[in-house]
From Swiss-Prot:
Organism: Wigglesworthia glossinidia brevipalpis
Keywords on record: DNA-directed RNA polymerase, Nucleotidyltransferase, Transcription, Transferase
One term under GO cellular component: DNA-directed RNA polymerase complex
HAMAP family reported in the protein's UniProt record: RNApol_bact_RpoZ (MF_00366)
One matching Pfam family: RNA_pol_Rpb6
Keyword Transferase: yes
Protein name per the record: DNA-directed RNA polymerase subunit omega
Coiled-coil region list: none
Family to which the UniProt record says this protein belongs: Belongs to the RNA polymerase subunit omega family.
Encoding gene (name): rpoZ
Function: Promotes RNA polymerase assembly. Latches the N- and C-terminal regions of the beta' subunit thereby facilitating its interaction with the beta and alpha subunits.
InterPro entries per UniProt: DNA-dir_RNA_pol_omega, Pol_omega/Rpo6/RPB6, RPB6/omega-like_sf
Molecular function via GO: DNA binding; DNA-directed RNA polymerase activity
Length: 62
């Protein structure tokens, strides 16, 4: 299981409410529309992958 520090992701986006919106949108893109993850999957769920992408600065608030 992945260890995600949500605080790091919040700092990248600005606040926790926007983080939820951005992460859920990205997870939806991967799950429904078949977009490729920008990080290794490591058997994680799409929401965890989205949070890892945000934490690494690969996804930004639009």
């Amino acid at each position: 299981m992945a260890r995600i520090t949500v605080q790091d992701a919040v700092e990248k986006i600005g606040n926790r409410f926007d983080l939820v919106l951005v992460a859920s949108q990205r997870a939806r893109e991967m799950q429904i529309f078949g977009k490729s993850p920008m990080v290794d999957k490591e058997n994680d769920k799409y929401t965890v992958i989205a949070l890892r992408e945000i934490e690494q600065g690969l996804i930004e608030k639009q």
